[in-house]
Amino acid sequence: MDYVLITFASTYGAIYAQKLLAPVAPVQVMPVLREVSLGCGMAVRLHPEDLPAVRAAMAGSQLKPEEYAFYAVTGTGETLQAHRIT
């Protein structure tokens, strides 16, 4: 896995997560890959090694689990693969 994306059902969720996660791990808000969109068009990108701390922070947040999803992303362009992490 090259990086992890968190996708969101709403723009509010993406902005909220960016603020929530800033003290936990370096994150970047970016346009979501259409292969993994939950609807709002924004995602938070993070390093795979930060996933456990980020998951813990998200689990303790006001966002409901159905409002966001984690994806493992590998490759770029035509070789890009994204798989949901459960």
Predicted regions and their residues:
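Amphipathic, hydrophobic secondary-structure cores in small proteins
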Residues: 9-11, 19-22, 26-56
